[in-house]
């Protein structure tokens, strides 16, 4: 089946998107003295008017929590390296966006804190959303290394193609049943667009092969995986599997034919950057109800989507793929946790973080359904602030949706999550530190 995308934006709305209601740790503090500034490190595109948005957020946080927020956005291409340098040095960091596999490495390096007691004391909104077990699911031997963002819990590998080119070359998406069916499509489009990359790939793990995999890598696919994760707990050599051989062979053939960029092995650009520049036809990506909104709003193009499966799989990375951790460098982890938990329960702060300031960066077009759009004269190219990565922030389910979004997006996201098939290893993360490699004698 094919999905046609005709929407902008990436987050949704609850019925109280315009409010700033929050509970538990969000109650007004009686603390006195100078407010503590919580430094939150994100990844994405630099925002011209970031300071203006910080001021608006701090107008909320200071009277509520005696705290302020300093947003640090690291560029996609160098974020991992920059964050590692920040954590290794004396630079002040309080909260950081990461994933379970990387967070475990930070944990063993002593660069992040155990969040268990912080959740107990300040994680009221977190526990209301997830319950205590899921709020603490990202842990090893009781050390909680991060808390999950409110996002889709499963995904379906799919092909995303620019809709204008699908229509221009009369591509029949009903004939696309599995990845190998894309070869004829690439051949057709490349003949008319010889300077365009047919399929995205980069050197930082964002490859067609990784996007197509339905294996559960248990936090580190390089050391083994569950190839039939919903039915078996047998760990297999991922690289020796029939699926890997067949898929890698297909992709190598496509590379030789020029469908994949010749610099894929050294490319560090994010796919959004390449697509926005008009140089990309398609990519394999995980489909869920929110991707149609995110793709067009972040690239300016509508996409035709063809999922390769009917149901999502919820596996070991579903609650650890995107998390927030508290850095060891934090000078006040209690205040950092208070601010983080507040954001999980505050539509007002979530909207500021993701969309900017109402009336300047966006206007509300449909209050009942929480739909917003750019003000007159403002576009994606000249907006002062439009972070537009709601999935990277704590709780996108309580924020506004962009014009063209399904009014029931978050209800459908919840239904999508509920429809998922669970991996036999759900909740497990492999701890690579347990493996000791001996030098040969």
Regions flagged by a language model, labelled:
Residues 2-438:
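Extracytoplasmic/secretory soluble proteins
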């Amino acid at each position: 089946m094919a999905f046609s995308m005709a929407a902008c934006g990436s987050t949704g709305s609850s019925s109280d998107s315009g409010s700033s209601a929050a509970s538990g740790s969000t109650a007004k503090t009686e603390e006195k003295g100078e407010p503590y500034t919580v430094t939150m490190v994100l990844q994405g595109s630099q925002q011209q008017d970031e300071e203006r948005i910080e001021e608006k957020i701090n107008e909320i946080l200071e009277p509520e929590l005696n705290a302020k927020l300093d947003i640090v956005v690291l560029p996609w291409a160098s974020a991992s390296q920059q964050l590692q340098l920040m954590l290794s040095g004396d630079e002040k960091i309080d909260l950081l966006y990461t994933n379970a596999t990387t967070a475990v490495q930070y944990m063993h390096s002593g660069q992040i804190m155990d969040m268990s007691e912080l959740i107990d004391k300040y994680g009221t909104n977190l526990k209301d959303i997830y319950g205590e077990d899921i709020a603490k699911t990202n842990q090893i031997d009781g050390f909680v290394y991060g808390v999950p963002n409110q996002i889709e819990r499963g995904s379906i590998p799919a092909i995303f193609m620019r809709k204008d080119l699908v229509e221009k070359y009369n591509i029949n998406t009903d004939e696309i049943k599995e990845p190998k069916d894309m070869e004829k499509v690439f051949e057709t489009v490349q003949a008319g667009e010889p300077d365009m990359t047919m399929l995205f790939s980069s050197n930082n793990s964002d490859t067609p092969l990784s996007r197509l995999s339905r294996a559960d890598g248990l936090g580190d696919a390089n050391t083994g995986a569950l190839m039939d994760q919903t039915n078996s707990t047998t760990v297999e050599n991922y690289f020796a599997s029939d699926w890997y051989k067949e898929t890698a062979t297909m992709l190598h053939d496509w590379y030789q034919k020029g469908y994949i960029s010749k610099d894929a092995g050294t490319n560090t650009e994010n796919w959004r950057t390449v697509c926005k520049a008009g140089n990309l036809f398609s990519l394999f990506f995980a489909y869920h109800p929110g991707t149609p909104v995110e793709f067009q709003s972040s690239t300016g193009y509508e996409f035709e989507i063809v999922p390769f499966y009917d149901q999502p799989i919820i596996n070991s990375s579903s609650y650890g793929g995107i998390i927030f951790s508290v850095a060891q460098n934090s000078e006040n982890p209690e205040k950092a946790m208070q601010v983080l938990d507040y954001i999980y329960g505050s539509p007002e702060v979530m909207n500021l973080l993701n969309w900017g300031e109402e009336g300047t960066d966006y206007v509300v077009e449909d209050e009942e359904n929480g739909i917003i759009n750019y003000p007159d004269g403002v576009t994606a190219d000249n907006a002062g602030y439009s972070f537009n990565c709601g999935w990277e922030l704590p709780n996108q389910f309580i924020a506004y949706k962009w014009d063209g979004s399904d009014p029931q997006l978050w209800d459908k996201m919840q239904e999508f999550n509920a429809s998922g098939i669970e991996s036999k290893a759900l909740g497990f993360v492999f701890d690579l530190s347990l493996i000791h490699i001996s030098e040969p004698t």
